[in-house]
């Protein structure tokens, strides 16, 4: 398989999802604006998303995909995938019942969860109303963890089989659910914000349903026992699953992985706690800025991580050390080639982007400026966040979870120290929260890179070749930045025209920036064929 082609497929599907995501955010901003209700909803969504990352896309995926890849490689040698299917069935059964338990506890304990994650809501203006609204919304959004965690497991299976398209397109269903519920259902709710909560629930159901045909096609649809009426039989099945050698290895890897992912998610929760004490709208400004930053991060970072982990796991199972290192080198160069212009573009075009997408309806000019501050801070850390997506799989594929965990713990401590300095001492407000994440991301990426070198995982690269590569890259970035600065003009020139005019103008500026960047790279000797890689 051509990895560049696979990256294009995943990025293309992700692009579709991101476009729908921006339409979703545009609709939410126009209908709901930024204020008490949106703050309540975004906090209500934070905890289910956090648990999703812990159980599925975080600790579980890091432990499950490398083991699954190893089983698949060995089974293919025997030409018998029965052992792999048993591993999938037993793992899915344990995951499903763990999710049921967590969901039930979460719904019951929602008042306490909201108090712990956003304590400032009680002391804010209209505090009691804001707190109660958040509690009610979270009771609806919490079951999303059950659906999306099983979706993430299905995605891990499909990606291991190099079936990247379905997992990549799956997020579009949640965005479609958001858009549909906002436009069609919100007017029929006494409090329209409840439409967004139900959109989360419905989206999770649709996403899970989409995985089933694809899993059936590769004969890997998990067989899960949901028989509540035969507890003894269920107990026996769960006991067998826990005693399975492959499942035990997954669980053993999950403990350090869970700690590592918990650290990063705790950092987000602590940021929410800081933000809950800031002025109304702070959580929303950070959210909208994060959505813009996540656009290139998803297109490149998530896509690279998706295609690298299964291939690296396969190389590790086969003992191909040099190919392993070469694949990491390929991922790092692509990251610098695509992430650095994206970061500069976000920073230079911050106000044009925000005003074009969100400056309408209840989203005020003040919100535009405040969101820009957050986006500037996030953009500075974008390359580092994507580098982490490339470097971390270098450890996960080798089933080494402890090293990234130690780095994550150190990063958490640094992030909170930066929060105190930037938010409390320097009074950077919500911008300080975003900046602390960016600075910590660079520190995280630096430590991961150092450890990969130290462990001789990433070793056969040319320093001279990298210096030459970076000098050419800096030249292209300088010319692109100059062209963007010349074309952007003043803030007023964007705020005083219609949204359609802003969109047309922004499209033209982006096209010119892209052409200048890639034309410069072409003149300097970069060719697409140089980045093609087969696995």
Where are these regions (language model features)?
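Membrane-embedded alpha-helical bundles of multi-pass transporters/translocases
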Residues: 1-535
